[in-house]
């Protein structure tokens, strides 16, 4: 049974951890570096392209068996098998490709620390971004990674990436796991995997320059497979750090104009970079996923978005409205 993906603790951890480059790799090199697959962005305007990506990129990654060489009883961190790391990386980069973001690589040093974090979570059968020294298999490197990683218990490898993207649960209304996975300004992550827990180092030591879309949403605009529906928890992030969602309003309508029920969560505020980019998260209910060859279009309007001035002293007069459409479809049907 999957445990909660504890974002509340993660949010606090992120707020308290400064953006400093990670320290040198430990003597144990940990899991090997895995180069990012050369995934070009997925054309979400093309149903066939999205379907092909789901069938050939995502599903094989999710089906990969989790293998690792460590031992919980012996507090041996070990390493994931290369095939397990590759599958996890492919899952991460699939979701980034759906959002038109650059792929990432897994850094060996970050992965070694994340591996020790995953070991602690598995050994203690619990999740904590501030694991106390009393925990089984505690290590300084593992504790550091715990504060910078997405954590999952009873979900590991590529399957944990899907859990992070869904980001269900009352403690995850900021969709932090998802938003860090889709953070535009990161080039390296680290992956720790045991048979019972996963730790994915997602918070960068420093931001990297990257081409990024102005907006990063989930679900993404265009064709979107039913199987990736995030249980109605939608999000919109801004690459521009000056964006302010404090008074933004959201509407989601069907293709015939029917308004769906929307519950807006507390926005991720401007000026809090340790929580990732400014963002708005909301819950959508009242629609059914399509079957057969049909698709179902949902039109999103986010209005009342404001922009801070360059000095961050006041909001400008500028107001932005962001509109986009999502077309759900069944990827099992050509």
Residue spans for each PLM region:
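Generic hydrophobic alpha-helical membrane-segment signal
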Residues: 1, 10-11, 157, 162
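N-terminal targeting leaders of exported, membrane, and organelle-targeted proteins
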Residues: 2-112, 116-120, 124, 187-188, ...
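A well-ordered secondary-structure block
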Residues: 30-40, 136-200
